[in-house]
Amino acid sequence: IENPQDKVAVVIVNDPGLGSDNTDYFNGDIMTYYGRWMYKFEEGARQGLKGVLIIHEDRGAGYPWSVVRASAQSKMDVDSDSDAYHCPLNGWIQFNAAKQLLADNGYDIDQLIEQSKSPDFKPISLKSTVTVSMRNTFDRQQSPNVIGYIPGSGNTDESVIYLGHWDHLGYGAPINGDSIINGATDNAVAIAWMLEMARCLNALKEKPRRNIVFLSPTCE
């Protein structure tokens, strides 16, 4: 990409192999890390882009636009890598909006998506420009990771690790006075499962040969 510092890339979600049975091309219909939104933002920063906009499509993303909209209200980063691989602008664009954007520049979105599946595909430049103005607030917080440990009875050079994050989205807009986002089908289920595994394994008369580690990080 020429002059990437002046460009905002518009990219498709998922891998080029989406919908394919050919597991030799990426991993076929199974998403690889290269199809994830985080990788696309990271790669955009590595290329020196001004920004990256991912075209949302339900099947490719695995969730509807409402999930993107809800998760865009806040973002958490670890201090040690908060400045790594971030473009000044990272975001998503609705499929129909991207379709109109490309049409305004003389391109058909479906044709371009099909062409992009070829290893020989090269990015195209659009005449459109984008102006963005936003205001952010930053807050630094500390949140502990939790770890539990059952010593092994035999081969203590090896460990089995059970992992589940105990928090996910933290706090949000109060619902009936409760602002905690409990995540009952996400982190709460994993923690309940992990605690029960710890209780059962610790109650065994004959302890497992390997060390058992229960790790619960603060974020997903």
Language-model features: where?
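A conserved hydrophobic secondary-structure block that centers on an alpha-helix together
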Residues: 1-70, 157
